[in-house]
Every structure is written in C-alpha cells, then in structure tokens.
Amino acid sequence: MRITVVGGGNIGTQFMVHCASKGHDVTAYTSKPEVFGSHLNIVDENEVTTLEGDIRKATNDPSEAFSDADFIMITLPSSMMRDIASVIYEHARPDAIIGVVPGNGGSECAFGKSIERGNTFFAIERVPAIARLVVKGRTVRSMGYRGELHVASLPASEVDRCCELISSIYDKPCKPIPNYLNLTMTPSNPILHTTRLRTIFGDYKPGVVYDSLPLFYEEWDDASSRLLIACDEEEQSICKALPEFRLEFVKSLRIHYESPTVEAMTAKISWIPAFRGLTTPSVEVDGKYIPDLHSRYFTADFSYGLSIIKQIGVFAGVDTPNIDETLDWYERIRIEQGDFSYSDYGINDFDDFRKFYLR
C-alpha cells in the first residue's frame, strides 16, 4: 500500500516506522524533508531498537506526496487541519483513505469536502503510544503502547475496513466505534487540562505573578477535581440528550479514573506514575511565574476541545454553566485567537449537525 504520513514529529515518525516495517511504500510529507534519512527506527526506554524500516522518500511537494497515495495519515495539531485538508483535497485521489490521530479537535469537519466526494475519513481515538523524537527524521522513542485501539469513520459504514488497516499496522486489536462523534467528544484533555488550568490560574490577569506553581498532576487538589467532575457531568448530560448518536464510548472521567468522588479523583490523579513530575505550563519572569498562554494546554484544549463540547451542547439544547464559566475565564486572558467553529463548515443548527455525523 502507498502510504503518506503528514507530519514528521513524534507520532508521525512512529507511524512511519510501523508502516515501513510492514513493507508498505511510505512517503513522509514534512516541512523539512532534508532531515529525513531513508532508514527509521523505534527504540525503547533503554535505547534498544524494537522496530525499524525504510521509507521511500520525504518531500514537501504535495503533488509528490498525495497524488498516488492509497492512504494518508495526518499527525498535525487540530489548528492546522483546515489548511492541510485543502491541500489534500486538491492533490489526493477521491478513493484515498484519509486518517488522523488523535480523533478529537474537529478535524472531521475540515475534511467535509473530501468525504462528500467519496474519500473515507477516519480517526484513531487516542495516540497508540507515547512517542518522543530522539533524532528527528531518524529515531523515535516509543513506550506504553495501548492494548486496544479505537477507530471511528465517516461514513460509519467504512469503520471495519479502517479498523483492519490500523490493526494490521500496529499489531493491536482495534475496536470499531459506531459514530464518529464519540471521538469528537473525548473528554480527556479538553476537560482534564482546562479545569486544572482554571483552578491554578483563576485569579490571573496581566501583571499578576506567582512565586511558585504546583506540579500539574502530582499536586492536584480537590478544587480541580470538583470543577472537573462538574464539567464532566455536563458533557454526560449532552450525551444523554443525543441518543441516536450512540455516544456510549464517551466515557465519564469518573469511570475512566475509577473515582466517583472529589476526594477519590484527587487521590487517583495525583498518584498516576506516568503523570509524576509534569509541571504546570508557565513562563519564568524575573524569578516569578506566569501562565504560558502559548502552551497547547491553552491553545488546543480550550479552542479545539472544550469549545467544541460547548457547541455540541448548544445543538443538543443542554445548559453547561461550568463549561461556560471555564471558557469565559480563558477568553479574558487568552493571547492567541482562533477557535474551532462548526459554523465555519456550514453546520449552523441541529439539522446540519445531525446530517454531518449520521452518515
């Protein structure tokens, strides 16, 4: 299969190695093709190679990358999806399969024109494993592979075919998700990160500085858990208001973390070994600290995460006061502009919304 991977970062490089190791004809579409060698490898935490393979080429020419691709996998941030979707629509075949990872962030709407003309679009719910570049264009470290991957597609009738493809590349079982909206509403980062940031920086405005900041997860507190649970409950109310979309895979964070109470949630999140030592996104100024408003925790998880959940709540007719207050807080302090909006893609009311996702 001719596979083009868009993005030469952590996840993109990992995906290239998995595809190349299976004998696929792999092209990297990247802004810096000159840094790529033909031989790529994955190493573990001990720097031991666990997987390797050869790609055909790296290029920044969209015609070279997409015109003969059978499968295009995109590993870019949500904010870049609209631009890359236009490029792919212009250069790719109408029968090419187009995938993204991870599946939240509204990327499906950017590819609406491609879906309409016949392209199958799908997403993997979450990244298959932790990936960190060791040498750009050559080596990536991968750890913590998920035991099972979840995939949804538009149209939904193609999900089994997409699952088979991803399962064959990663050698992992792949579970088909009945409706793509389950991926759009994945609550992990859009609720986990945003509620914690609001709790830590709730009093922030230009001029306010902090002598010190808590570790983001390891020093998680009850106030953060209380807001997280409130926003999570609001999202679950949205899911209950949309029964025909089969949103049973939008799992409550209380179930995901096995923490039904505020106190249990605090204990669980502050204990998770993979979260230990992770700092709060901040910038040091004269020995003090201010929030790093350019961090993806802000720019992605509010604008392409919690904001989308809010918009779906409006379509469903569900009030979301805690989500609203959290978004209003961010609006007062934000630096970077540009949010995902369904209206940008002609989805202006519930009928438009229903037509898009129930296909």
Regions found by a protein language model. Give the residues of each.
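NAD(P)+-binding Rossmann beta1-loop-alpha1 motif at the extreme N-terminus of oxidoreductases
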Residues: 1-47
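Short beta-strand/turn micro-motifs composed of small residues
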Residues: 7, 30, 76, 102, ...
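Substrate/ligand-engaging "lid" and interaction regions
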Residues: 11, 128-231
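A general structural motif
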Residues: 23, 69, 93-95, 118, ...
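Hydrophobic/aromatic beta-strand patches that form the interior of the parallel beta-sheet core
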Residues: 27-29, 59, 73, 99, ...
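Rossmann-like NAD(P)-binding element
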Residues: 50-92
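Rossmann-like NAD(P)(H) cofactor-binding subdomain of soluble oxidoreductases
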Residues: 78-139
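NAD(P)-dependent Rossmann-like dehydrogenase/reductase catalytic/cofactor-binding core
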Residues: 204-211, 218, 225-359
